[in-house]
Regions:
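Generic structural motif
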Residues: 25, 36-40, 52-55, 64, ...
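Acidic, glycine-anchored pre-beta loop/turn
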Residues: 46-52, 82-84
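Short hydrophobic beta/alpha edge segments that flank linear recognition/processing sites
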Residues: 53-66, 81, 89-97
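Conserved small/polar residues in nucleotide/adenosyl-binding loops
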Residues: 142-149
Length: 150
């Protein structure tokens, strides 16, 4: 199906936009929210007061060992907030610095499926995947295929 637009809509705006870019203020605290990870039962790997770097493991899923959530910022763990039945509400990090963990990874062409899965789990990228239809994090041993389909 092809759509052709014959006429557009000219909105009569007067003036021009300001040609400036505002610099945002630095963030003082960030939080990893437990509600972002449906069905995850965390085993905490850090405590309040611990120093973390970007990519430092914060907690791991009890039900799926190997599924790790990492720190989005470098700094100090300011608070670990729990709710009813000790459910994780948030892990608050007071931002200080920009140090990051280094992860060893191979060239994509030379890496095996297990190598890619291991790096994704260690770096915290695995939790970006979601299963359907409930939006949960996939188990650590899920077989992933990445190929072009028609």
């Amino acid at each position: 199906m092809l759509f052709k637009i014959k006429k557009g809509l000219d909105i009569p705006l007067k003036g021009r936009p300001d040609e400036r870019i505002d610099v945002a203020t630095d963030v003082k605290t960030v939080a990893v929210l437990g509600s972002d990870y449906i069905g995850l039962k965390p085993t905490m790997l850090v405590r309040e007061g611990d120093q973390v770097k970007v990519g430092t493991p914060l907690f791991e899923d009890k039900k799926n060992p190997g599924v790790i959530v990492t720190s989005p910022a470098a700094g100090t763990v300011a608070a670990i907030n729990r709710g009813a039945k000790r459910a994780l509400v948030s892990v608050v990090i007071a931002v200080d610095g920009d140090e990051a963990e280094a992860f060893a990874c191979k060239e994509v062409a030379a890496a095996s499926e297990a190598d890619v899965r291991k790096v994704m789990q260690e770096s915290g990228l695995w939790v970006a995947f979601r299963t359907r239809p409930y939006g949960k994090i996939p188990v650590s041993y899920t077989h992933l295929r990445a190929h072009e389909t028609s």
